[in-house]
From Swiss-Prot:
UniProt: Ca(2+) binding residues: D66, D68, N70, T72, E77
Gene3D superfamilies associated with the record: EF-hand
Lineage of producing organism: Eukaryota, Viridiplantae, Streptophyta, Embryophyta, Tracheophyta
Domain (EF-hand) ranges: 53-88, 89-124, 145-180, 184-219
Organism: Arabidopsis thaliana (Mouse-ear cress)
Protein name per UniProt: Probable calcium-binding protein CML22
Encoding gene per record: CML22
Length: 229
């Protein structure tokens, strides 16, 4: 009975975090105008090499805070990292995001989970107001230069602006009739959405998008692998 209560409480916390992220993505449309410059999947793929380089730099950050060199970061190591990066959230929010991103239940954050976790914290820690001078200054330039373009890709795919991706919009965007030479095969677009839609609900939140997007970008893969697989 206790286990069921704990799981229910955790699910409620995760649902609240998911809803908060969705609201943040809606608010972000005016803060990240770069999403309007994206026209097709090719324009997204062109960002992959720079993002891949940035992710390699993030690995250096990860390794510098993995004090016991076990390939994971625990909650205390994460807090030290966030303090150094000047990213501030409440302890409760950090703990909730930490467990939410520990998708394999290993009680430690691995590198791919760390990227997603750091991006979520960066996004939620930033002010929502476009007029705030801190909104473009918070956090190191390294983190901003990597995560801002990823947010813009999500906003590009989120055509209805509700903070969630739905299958019809994503497929329509990737098969944009205005760019016939850059259209993705239908089986590829369906597969890409399924990679994001873990619960097979037809809706994808920012966290699920992040995990899928990291695998698309890769750290060692060639750019054309994304379109041909």
């Amino acid at each position: 009975m206790l286990c069921c209560c704990v799981n229910s409480e955790n699910n409620k916390k995760y649902a609240e975090l998911d809803a908060k992220l969705a609201r943040k993505m809606v608010e972000s449309r005016s803060i990240y105008p770069g999403h309007r410059s994206l026209k097709s999947m090719d324009s997204i793929i062109m960002k992959f090499p720079k993002l891949r380089e940035g992710l390699r730099n993030i690995r250096s950050v990860f390794e510098s805070y993995d004090n016991d060199t076990n390939g994971t970061i625990d909650i205390e190591e994460l807090k030290k990292c966030l303090e150094e990066l000047k990213l501030s959230l409440s302890d409760e929010e950090v703990k909730g995001l930490y467990s939410w991103c520990d998708v394999d239940g290993s009680k430690g954050i691995q590198f791919n989970e760390f990227i997603v976790l750091l991006c979520l914290i960066y996004l939620l820690a930033k002010p929502s107001s476009e007029s705030s001078t801190e909104s473009r200054e918070m956090g190191p330039k390294l983190v901003e230069s990597i995560f801002d373009p990823i947010v813009e890709v999500f906003l590009f795919l989120d055509k209805d602006g509700k903070g969630k991706l739905n299958k019809a919009d994503v497929i329509k965007t990737l098969n944009n009739e205005d760019y016939p030479l850059e259209r993705s095969p239908s089986h590829v677009t369906n597969m890409r959405f399924e990679e994001m839609d873990w619960g097979r609900k037809g809706k994808v939140g920012f966290r699920e998008f992040l995990f899928a997007f990291m695998s698309w970008v890769g750290l060692d893969d060639a750019d054309d692998d994304f379109m041909s697989s």
